[in-house]
Amino acid sequence: MIINESYLNVADNSGAKLLRVIRVMGGSRRKWGTVGDIVVCSVRDAVPNGDLKKGDVVKAVIVRTKKEIRRPDGSYIRFDDNAAVVLDKYNEPKGTRVFGPVAKELREKGFMKIVSLAPEVF
C-alpha cells in the first residue's frame, strides 16, 4: 500500500532514481494505491545529465509493492521493494527500459508497453 509521502524506487531508465508520492490519483479521498495505480510524485534523486532532475513533478505507475496483493484465485504476490515507472502525458513509459519484475495486474490495467518492456512478469 502506497500512501502520500511514500518513497518509490524507479524501475526504468528515465533518469530518476527515487520518487516521493505527492498524491494517489483516482478520487478526492483516495488513501492508498497498489500495483497499477497512477501516482503524482516528486523526483528526490536523479542521475546526473538525465532527462529528469531533483524537484521535478511527474506521474508514475506503481509496478511493485512490498505489501502483498491478493489475486482472484486466492494466491498472493509481494515484492522486495516499492517501485514505479515514470509516465509521460499520454500514460506511456518515459524510459525505454524497465528493470526488475512487474506484476501481471499491469496488463489488466492497460499498461501493455510496460509489460512488454519488463524482463519478467509475475
Swiss-Prot record:
GO terms for biological process: translation. One of its GO terms (molecular function) is structural constituent of ribosome. Binds to 23S rRNA. Forms part of two intersubunit bridges in the 70S ribosome. It comes from Thermosipho melanesiensis (strain DSM 12029 / CIP 104789 / BI429). Part of the 50S ribosomal subunit. Forms a cluster with proteins L3 and L19. In the 70S ribosome, L14 and L19 interact and together make contacts with the 16S rRNA in bridges B5 and B8. Belongs to the universal ribosomal protein uL14 family. This is Large ribosomal subunit protein uL14. Keywords: Ribonucleoprotein, Ribosomal protein, RNA-binding, rRNA-binding.
